[in-house]
Each structure stands twice: as structure tokens, then as C-alpha cells.
Amino acid sequence: LQRYAAGILADEGFTLTTTPDLARNEILSGIGYQPRGPETQIYSIENTELSLVGTAEITLGGMYAEQTLDAEQLPIKLAGISHCFRTEAGAAGKATRGIYRVHQFTKVEMFAFTEGDAENKASSAMLEDLLRIECKLFDGLGIPYRVIDTPIGDLGGPAYRKYDLEAWMPGRGDGGAWGEVTSTSNCTDYQARRLGIRFKRKGEKGTTFVHTLNGTAVAMSRALIAVLENYQQADGSVVVPEALRGWVGKDRISPR
């Protein structure tokens, strides 16, 4: 699944990166996460100003902290392959059991820097492109899904607009249910202001804050649920999606 996602992102013009598992708390705060507190989703390292990352968004966004980019460099599209660590504070109930919510998983994350403008033209176009790529990934896997345009009241602090992809998971709930597998957000200049990331247009005075966007390509645990539950057969075997057969080396996984 990682190689499948990474291959598509490389073809889409993303620079592939392997990101660290630790980040400075000032970067977490700049991205919009709270590294301390009773309801935090972050694992902090005692007696340090470091925390385990919950997503590569944190380290990818922090790559250009306190820098001024040239407009000609934009957009910058990065893909991070990382471990993700989350406390999952407050998670409970049957729907969260198994590997749907876990404390550590691997994820391929998209992150983009675009020019900032009052109409959000560049970042809005990029958001639609990130959504297109997420749909392309799950179309390629043959997984049924739906797109949710997140209501304003459900947006977190950093996000100006956010889409979720929910995949059909036959084993979820009593008779199957939709489960979130990706999300993509346009944070406009929220993160850039806090991290001090600007850009300069040639021939113009002054600088402007960039806009930042993030999006899940594939979160391994949840994508695996969707693949296994949609492709499992009556005899217990699992048909391997055609897009993955080159890496799996077979077209069906049989029970032992």
C-alpha cells in the first residue's frame, strides 16, 4: 500500500520524503497541535521540548519554518512516509476497536505550499487536486467510498475547508458502515503565520504568507481494513486488488 501510494504521488509531481518521528513542540504548536494538556492526542517526551509526531504534516510543514520562498518555487508538493503516534484520548466504543484506532501506524501524507492571496485561488485549486488524488488512490483499489465536505462547525482551528473520504467497511457496526480513511485540508495562512513561512514575488516589494495544505494519501491501518473487508471471500480468502498484485506477488491470499 505504501509503494502503491508513493508511486502515484511521484507521478503526480510530489517529492518523496521520509520524515522524523520527533518534532519540536514549537513546530507542533505552529501547525495547530497542542503537545500538552489532558486531552492532547500527542505523546510528549518527558523533560524535553520534543514530541512524537501524530502525522507527517507536522514535520513537512516545519521544513520551511522562518523562511522566505521565491514565488517561482511554488507550489511545493511533498509526500511524507512516516510513523504516526496518537494517544487517541477519549476514543471508546465498538466502532473504535481493532485496528481502526491505534496508537501507532504508518501513513503516506501529502503536503503543499502555494502562493497566498485574498481570494485563496491557488490553495483552493490545490485542495481540489489533493482530493482528486485521494479519489484516484481509492478508485485504483476498487474500494467504495464517499466524499464528505466537512461542515464549518466541525472544522478544526487550522482548516479553512476540509474534505474527508469515507470508505465502506462491511465489518464495521452491525451491518457495515462508512469509516474515515483520508482527510485533506486547506489551512490558508493559519500555519504559515505561526511558522513564519513567506514568499516573495519577483519585482514586488514586501512578502506574503504562503498557504499550506495537507492530505492523507494512505493511512495503512484503515486502508487495510477497507481492502480486507471488501475483498474477503466466503471461503476466508482475500482477493488482492489488481493495483497491488505486483508487490504482493499473488492475486489471492488464502487462509492457513
Where are these regions (language model features)?
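TRNA-recognition modules of translation machinery and tRNA-sensing kinases, especially anticodon-binding
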Residues: Q2-R256
